[in-house]
Amino acid sequence: MKLNKSYILIVVLLLSLFYSSVSSTKTTLIKSNNHYNSDNSNNDNKNININNNNDGDGDDDDDNNKILITPENQNHLIHDIGIDSSSTEILFGSSSNSGSCGEKNNTKQNALANQREANTIIFIIMLILTGSVLIVYFIISLDIPFVPESVAVVTYGIILGIVFRFFYSDIVNHVVSFEPENFFLFILPTIIFETGYSLHKTDFFNNIGPILMFAVFGTIITFLVVGFGIYIVGYFGVSIALSLKDSFAFGSIISSTDPVCTLAIFQALNVDPMLYILVLGESILNDATSMMLYSVVEDTSTRDIIISCAMFTVVAIGSVILGVVMALLLSLILKWINIGKFPALETIFMVMFSYMSYVLAGALDISGVLAVFFFGITLNQYGAYSLSPYTKLTSGQLFRTAAFISETFLFLYFGLSLTAHEFKFDLGLFSWSILFTCLARAISVFPMCFLLNKFLKTKIPWVIQVAIWFAGLRGAFAFSLSLDYISEDEHMNAYIRTNTLLVVVFTIFVFGMGTYPLLRVLGIKTSQTDQSLDNISKPMSKQTKQKDRTKLYESFDDKYFKPWFRKRVPPLANEAIEIFEKMVIQSSHDHELDSNPLRFDDDEEDDDDEDLDFDSDLDLNININTDSIHQSDNNNNDNGNNNNNNNNIIINNNSQHHSNDGSNNKNNDTLPLI
């Protein structure tokens, strides 16, 4: 495919802006440092050397005759020497007025300098993120399936980190000063909530048994294999020797498969639904297991191990209950408070409650990841039906966009961290860590799938098992735990953090780039038509819906939960929303070229003979107002007078207007589709 001139223009513009911004950043940093140094020199304590043996030659020969004047001893010195108050300000200045004014001016100047520096750094970060988005766009446009977006962004971060490290080291130091607590507070909840909110619930709960087996027992197996393995090779001198506690701490850290990296790759490839849901569920739920194992390592006594195992059950159940309760509470608010006319308020409620569930879980020492994940699932099941049609259609895209930005920043942070990290590398430790990680993954996947196939009606094929083994990517969760861990031997902290970071990058590059070729070799279905941002966390295909759900749960849900927590929406509104969604989906696929949704041919005419046909001159609007919909048949008659019915789908094609009665009904809630 030939590159358009617009691509080259965008790249040139981006590079020019980047160079100018980097230069301005360096200038700002130099000025702020010089200003800070000058302020420190000007704010030193005033001193006066009083020499009782002054011979007039200006030399101070006797150091014992020197008296240091400071604000603390100034008053005592004045009294002892006998200087009157009128001469005090001449000798020392007004310590109460001029000193305070100088301090205020210096403080104000420092604040302005810091503000300029912060604004420049933020601009640099935004510019780097813009470059990351352009890279993702180029990968999709050029149709490079074997290079996931995550790998490309990490590589982009490494290249920028190298440039900054040698020329503008202050910039990379500011960027990588991002604390692990900020990752857990801002980035992770956004990604996990969007995953739960857009998850296909039927696939998830139909496979909850295998998911729990992988998430709990598989994580414990990885913890034991890696911990024992690292300790044994260190004991025999094959690699650097870690203590038993440090070895198992590393095992608990590396046992966490990261949902962000896994989701980014699997969603881009649109893999088989069973593979997607098993790996997704494991990566989400095993965080609680990893945290439990990590806390056990802190104290290895038998009593604490038993307590930690019991606490793991409490944490898991409590996290699920908290997420469900918060979602049901929001569902009641959306049902009984009529805020459908204010879509922005509905979206704000959803964002606030999702974060409240996450931070409240952290305050209660339970898993915020599990809480916000099940909050998203429950909200989609009940609260979403009380949202206005406009919010239903826009909130999903908003959450997908926020998750995409968070993922991009995270992968970029990985790349920059590699160049700013204080490395203490041991080849033996790294090599054995990779070997034991892959071995532990194989031990936890293949025997467990063999046992599950003995009891499950839906078998896990061998090709899916191989793909699950290959999908054990590590990511930000493991790296954040390594930053939090403090070894009893201080110099081992750097080894553990370096080794964890290298294992994370290795799995992202090797397993990430090898996923697509492996799926092709195994013959597992993939699709590139709905890649990246347009399809982040896309629900599973309707063909994968299974009909073996428990009838007891269905009847209980239909009889109690749905009437309690869902707003009753008339069927006509639901039908209109479904038609609108189909129009949006088809409008994106009608212009599809070479199986890529971001490519359009301006000269190609649309010859699709589907039920809904779109031309370039078609102006399509949908009018929905659920407040004026009634179930009575009197409002749906065809007597030519439909002024009270605001549920018509009006299609305007410049010269003609189609409606039920041939009239033009005005509606304030018009949603432009094109």
UniProtKB/Swiss-Prot annotation:
Membrane topology of the entry: Multi-pass membrane protein
Residue span of region Disordered: 31-65, 591-674
This protein's name: Sodium/hydrogen exchanger 1
InterPro entries linked to this entry: Cation/H_exchanger_CPA1, Cation/H_exchanger_TM, NaH_exchanger
Family affiliation: Belongs to the monovalent cation:proton antiporter 1 (CPA1) transporter (TC 2.A.36) family.
Transmembrane segments: 120-140, 144-164, 175-195, 213-233, 275-297, 314-334, 336-356, 359-379, 401-421, 432-452, 460-480, 499-519
Pfam family, one: Na_H_Exchanger
Major localisation: membrane
Gene Ontology molecular function terms on file: potassium:proton antiporter activity; sodium:proton antiporter activity
Gene of this entry: nhe1
